[in-house]
């Protein structure tokens, strides 16, 4: 926040849902030295009543979380990330870079359209009556056409479950009618 000559261009956004693994808790903050940004943010904030009480109460409790918790969570997510990235990059035609600060990756898949592939996986493909889900990444891009064959894949499952999900994904990619390789 104190970068010389850039203080008017820096916005810090944080949330308890990300910092404390409180998925769905809509409690967070926005900080900036830019008065126009803060005035616009306040207009939105004042138009809303408040986050749900349960999320507020959980957030208060989360503030007392010991540092050791974060070290354990970080180590676990690094393990999950490395497992996921290695597994994806071993699949024919799949590429994903190593994320450095998220719990998901954006993977390039050998498919004609990830929206169609994701729907096909959910509606048609099964192994032992199970499937896996990917999130089409096109909506994360502003440029039209970007991300059409990319998927956002979270590594929030434990490694044993991810292993199964990766196997299902790999077999689904092999069987998908819109495969491009």
Regions found by a protein language model. Name each.
Residues 1-181:
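PLP-dependent class I/II
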């Amino acid at each position: 926040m104190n970068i010389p000559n850039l203080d008017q261009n820096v916005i810090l956004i944080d949330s308890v849902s990300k910092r404390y693994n409180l998925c769905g808790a809509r409690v967070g903050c926005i900080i900036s030295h830019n008065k126009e940004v803060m005035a616009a943010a306040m207009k939105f904030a004042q138009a809303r009543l408040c986050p749900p009480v349960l999320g507020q109460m959980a957030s208060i409790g989360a503030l007392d979380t010991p540092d050791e918790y974060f070290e354990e969570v970080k180590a676990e997510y690094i393990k999950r990330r490395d497992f996921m990235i290695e597994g994806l990059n071993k699949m024919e035609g799949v590429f994903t870079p190593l994320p450095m600060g998220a719990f998901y990756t954006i993977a390039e898949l050998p498919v004609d359209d990830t929206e169609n592939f994701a729907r096909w996986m959910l509606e048609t493909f099964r192994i032992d009556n199970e499937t896996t889900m990917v999130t089409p990444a096109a909506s994360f891009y502003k440029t039209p056409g970007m991300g059409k064959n990319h998927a956002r894949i979270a590594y929030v499952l434990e490694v044993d479950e991810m292993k199964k999900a990766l196997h299902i994904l790999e077999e689904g990619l092999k069987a998908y009618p819109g495969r491009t390789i």
